[in-house]
Amino acid sequence: MAIERTFSMIKPDATRRNLTGAIIAKLEEAGLRVVASKRVWMSRREAEGFYAVHKDRPFFGELVEFMSSGPTVVQVLEGENAIAKNREVMGATNPANADEGTIRKAFALSIGENSVHGSDAPETAAEEIAYWFSGTEIVG
């Protein structure tokens, strides 16, 4: 297995409830290492840019509003099979369908307020990491 990097975000519903440490602990327990992290309050413009892939979807406006409603923690995670491992630890997008022991089963409030975001492929991981971090900010 190759060591890879992925992008991870702790969303406003989770930071609002002081779950940052608990979520990071679950990621680290799964063997993922945080190699870059910062707390940001997204502007509407940043949220629109980050989620531009969804701009034609009916939920786009609500997503942008939610993501700019409070602080997020953006991170770069590193580990073996990091993308798949992070997605496994996060659980299904809809917390009602998430497996026991996953972040979303434990902490998500709804399909919209589902506590975390993670890249789904190497290409999106690279794009999402570059959106928030310069190369010098990633130290691992």
Swiss-Prot record:
Reading the lineage from the top rank, the first entry is: Bacteria
Binding residues for ATP: K11, F59, R87, T93, R104, N114
Identify the PROSITE patterns for this entry: NDPK, NDPK_LIKE
- What does the organism's lineage look like at the top? Bacteria, Pseudomonadati, Pseudomonadota, Alphaproteobacteria, Hyphomicrobiales
Pfam families in alphabetical order: NDK
What name appears for this protein in its UniProt entry? Nucleoside diphosphate kinase
**One GO MF term, please?**
nucleoside diphosphate kinase activity
* GO-annotated cellular components: cytoplasm
Q: Which residues form the active site?
A: H117 (pros-phosphohistidine intermediate)
Q: Which reaction does it catalyse?
A: a 2'-deoxyribonucleoside 5'-diphosphate + ATP = a 2'-deoxyribonucleoside 5'-triphosphate + ADP; a ribonucleoside 5'-diphosphate + ATP = a ribonucleoside 5'-triphosphate + ADP
Cofactor(s) required for function per UniProt: Mg(2+)
EC class name: transferase
Q: What gene name is listed for this protein? A: ndk
Binding partners and assembly: Homotetramer.
What compartments host this protein?
Answer: Cytoplasm
